[in-house]
């Protein structure tokens, strides 16, 4: 977060302004998605000291491909207002390994998890569908790393935890 805030542009008249200060939410979501996906690739490859994962940019079946395993990982990201449910979207409703990340617009709070998400957890729509968080809470193959999924008064609540030191 701090690195992005440090990037500035010069406006007419020489005035300096934050480069990401007035960016649309969906564009910021795309930037978060790319940084997150590439970071997972880099960490896995560094840890294994060889290229295990690739992050193709050609609308491949998966966001992260493990060619030697003929498999992949789908990453889903969302920029989510505090107190709201994240909206993870997809064009394909596949069962498989997913890594989810939701971050608040100011970057201070995060929800993250990973695991196998069944295809029936997706609400189909055109042109994109959304992950049904109400079904996700009952999926035993999904693990929350940061934040929590809880049922309160019959409703599923997604809690984002602070990531500030």
PLM segments and residue spans:
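Nucleic-acid endonuclease domains
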Residues: 1-62, 67, 77-165
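Extended, Lys/Arg-enriched charged tracts that mediate electrostatic binding to polyanionic substrates
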Residues: 72-74
């Amino acid at each position: 977060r701090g690195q992005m805030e440090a990037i500035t542009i010069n406006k007419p008249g020489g005035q300096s302004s934050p480069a990401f200060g007035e960016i649309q939410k969906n564009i910021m979501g795309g930037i978060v998605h790319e940084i997150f996906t590439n970071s997972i690739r880099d960490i896995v490859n560094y840890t294994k000291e060889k290229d295990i994962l690739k992050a193709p940019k050609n609308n491949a079946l998966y966001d992260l491909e493990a060619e030697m395993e003929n498999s992949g990982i789908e990453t889903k990201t969302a920029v989510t207002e505090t107190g709201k449910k994240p909206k993870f979207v997809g064009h394909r409703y596949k069962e498989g390994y997913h890594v989810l990340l939701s971050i608040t617009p100011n970057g201070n709070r995060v929800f993250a998890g990973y695991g196998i998400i069944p295809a029936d957890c997706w609400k189909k729509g055109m042109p994109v569908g959304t992950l049904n968080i109400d079904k996700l809470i009952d999926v035993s193959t999904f693990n929350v790393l940061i934040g929590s999924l809880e049922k309160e008064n019959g409703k599923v609540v997604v809690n984002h935890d602070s990531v500030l030191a």
